[in-house]
Structures are given as structure tokens and as C-alpha cells.
Amino acid sequence: MQNELIIETINLVKDYFDGDRVIHALRDANIKIYRGEMVAIMGPSGSGKSTLLYVLGLLHPPTAGQYLFKGQDILEYSKEEQALFRNRELGFVFQSCDLLANSTVFENLELPLIYAETDRQSRRAKILRALDRVGLSHRVDHWSNRLSGGERQRAAIARALVNNPSLILGDEPTGQLDQKNTEIVIEQLRDIARQGFTVVLVTHEDEIGAACDRIIRIRDGAVVSDGLENYIIPQVVKRSPKDMISVSEI
């Protein structure tokens, strides 16, 4: 259902403590993100954008505030419930692809299914479906260390998708890719959002922000603007899918 509210944060605070010094990484962050959106979180280095992403991913607990996921305050869950929720509802893509080098693509994608207690009989079908979404089903039994850089990151996206999560979180997912592979990965993420997944990316690249539906800007831990119309990107235009490089070209 389009316009379904997936994420709502209410006065979200994250503080870090360095001796007697308090570092305010997030200050009363209030955001809403809907199903099928591809949203960029942007801001200067040290602004709190990655902190917000990690709080949304339940990797860093907030100091105060509420985090509602489909209307449920998941901060009230036990640690065990949060871990199960994270494995089933969230998918992660990081800047440095962390596939296990001495394992096959299948074995890498099987791990989150094992953690989510998926029965063995259905795992291969789920893995092939996820790989097909990024054009890599033909690599399912290949060693991950034999993949190109772009293929490894696409396999990482497939791994994020394998449990059919509601939310994909990416922390600079194209940071180590060249321009050609960056365009491929971003268009694949846009296609994933069009299929009803919600995609949230931390990025410092204006062109990636321009490819998103919306930009949330953060400065000094505070949300200072929310919406593409509030963020002017000079000499960058939003590309249509036909302008992007196709997967078959690599």
C-alpha cells in the first residue's frame, strides 16, 4: 500500500559520552518515511547522518525519544525481539562490501536466512529471487572473491533483500564504486523502491541525492530540512531509468 507510514521518529536523541563531555549526535530528530520511498540523508561530516541511520537500524540505541515502525514503538521490544525484528524487517548495505571472501554467493546470502530461522527447503528459491532483482542469479554458486567490485556490491544488495524486508538501509553504498557501477547500483535501488521496498541512504554525493524521492538534511545532529524542494543541487538533474547504464553493460 503506497503512502503507508513505515518510519516515524519523535524527538529522537542520541548522545555519546567522552568522560565528562557529552556529544549530542542527534537532537530531537523528527522524520517520517513512507513505503516505496527512496530517501537520502545528507549533511556535512560529523553532522549525525550515519548516527541516524544506525539508530534506525537498531545498531545504536537512542538516548531518548520514540522510534515507530509501522506504528509500533520498537524501542519497547526486548533485545531478543529487536534482534529478530532486525533480521526479518531490515536489510543493510555498507560502503565496504563485507561478503565472506572464501564462501560462495549462495553461502553469503544464506546467512541472514539462517539467522531469521528460514527453513532449509525455501532458502535457495529466496536467494535466487533476491539475486534476480540485481541481475546476478547466474552467479549464485560462484566464489564471492571472484566477483568484480560492482558485482560484490550488487550481491550485498541482494543479501539485504533476501529476507524480503520492509526497509533497506545503506551507508554510503556506492562510496567505493566507479561512476559506471554507481549508476547501476542507484538505478537498481530505485527499482527496488518501485517494487514497494523503502530505501534510506546516507550519502554525501549530490547526484545520488538527486536520484532520490526526498532528501533529509542534518546539521549538528538536527534535521534542518526535509524534502527535495528545500535542497538545491546545482547542475544536477534527476535521471530517468532510460538514461542510466543497464546491468547488461557490465
What are these regions (language model features)?
Residues M1-Q2:
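Short, low-complexity, intrinsically disordered N-terminal peptides in bacterial proteins
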Residues A222-S248:
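Conserved beta-strand-loop-alpha-helix hinge in the C-terminal portion
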Residues L5-I218:
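ABC family nucleotide-binding domain
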